[in-house]
């Protein structure tokens, strides 16, 4: 609690987490069409089949119940930095991920700290470009919904 309040020299120095779009229930899901529904939130029925048999996503639910347009974190709180786990990146199978981890110790090092050249030296330019694009937010994400994780498009 002291770190959350920035008391007695304690503080949060970084705040990393999964991009919400990758979550299993981020967007509303049409049970009839069997797919997540993109578009202006909140979604209360499927625009394709007009069904109201939907599983409402977290993003859409927040739009319905929010009481403010924006929120503000305390000035001492670091920003929330979205990350995309290696397992979500196309072209990175278990062997490639193991190779990266054996060379660089932790996924956090790979996702946030290493240079493109360091990554490229171990797994090649194509994979290094994917990791760096994900780090910089230069990837398109197909939102998850209805119990299915989102994915890089």
Outline where the language-model segments fall.
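Charged catalytic cores and adjacent phosphate/nucleic-acid-binding surfaces used
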Residues: 1-153
């Amino acid at each position: 609690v002291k770190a959350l309040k920035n008391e007695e020299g304690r503080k949060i120095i970084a705040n990393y987490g999964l991009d919400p779009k990758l979550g299993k229930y981020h967007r509303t899901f049409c049970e009839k069409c069997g797919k997540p529904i993109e578009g202006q939130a909140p979604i209360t029925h499927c625009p394709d089949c007009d069904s109201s048999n939907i599983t409402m996503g977290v993003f859409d639910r927040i739009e319905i119940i929010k009481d403010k347009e924006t929120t503000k974190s305390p000035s001492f709180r670091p920003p929330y930095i979205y990350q995309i786990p290696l397992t979500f990146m196309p072209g990175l199978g278990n062997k490639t991920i193991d190779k990266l981890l054996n060379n660089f110790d932790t996924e956090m090092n790979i996702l946030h700290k290493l240079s493109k050249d360091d990554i490229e030296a171990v797994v090649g330019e194509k994979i290094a470009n994917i990791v760096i694009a994900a780090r910089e937010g230069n990837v398109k994400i197909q939102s998850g919904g209805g119990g299915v994780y989102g994915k890089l498009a």
